[in-house]
């Protein structure tokens, strides 16, 4: 399980970079609120994360249902963190770090036990 989590984390680093860049562009260039910026970062990064983890971490086939399960869960998580950040007036960097930590742990558990549960 630790080896699997290490692979998931490696892909997560790239995913996080993608997410953070999009988030920053939305906040500092497009001047959106944090909920929208966090969700936009998620949308761009989630497909990479899904396909990379399916192939390299879980060695599983990609199906529409698996993709929808993953995107639905992670999207809800992203929107919730962004909404809470706006309600609490958190600085954008705190929002990014918070979402990155929560999504790493929750995303791994959800992927392993729900999305890719019947994979190898």
From Swiss-Prot:
It comes from the Bacteria. GO terms for molecular function: glutamyl-tRNA reductase activity; NADP binding. Residues 31-33, 86-88 are periplasmic. It is a multi-pass membrane protein. Residues 1-9, 55-64, 110-120 are cytoplasmic. Keywords: Cell inner membrane, Cell membrane, Membrane, Transmembrane, Transmembrane helix, Transport. It is found in: Cell inner membrane. InterPro entries: Glc_translocase_bactprenl-link (IPR016480), GtrA_CellWall_Glycosyl (IPR051401), GtrA_DPMS_TM (IPR007267). GO terms for biological process: heme biosynthetic process; polysaccharide biosynthetic process. GO terms for cellular component: plasma membrane. The chain crosses the membrane at residues 10-30, 34-54, 65-85, 89-109. Disulfide bonds: none annotated. Its main location: membrane. Belongs to the GtrA family. Involved in O antigen modification. Involved in the translocation of bactoprenol-linked glucose across the cytoplasmic membrane. This is Prophage bactoprenol-linked glucose translocase homolog. It comes from Escherichia coli (strain K12). The gene is yfdG.
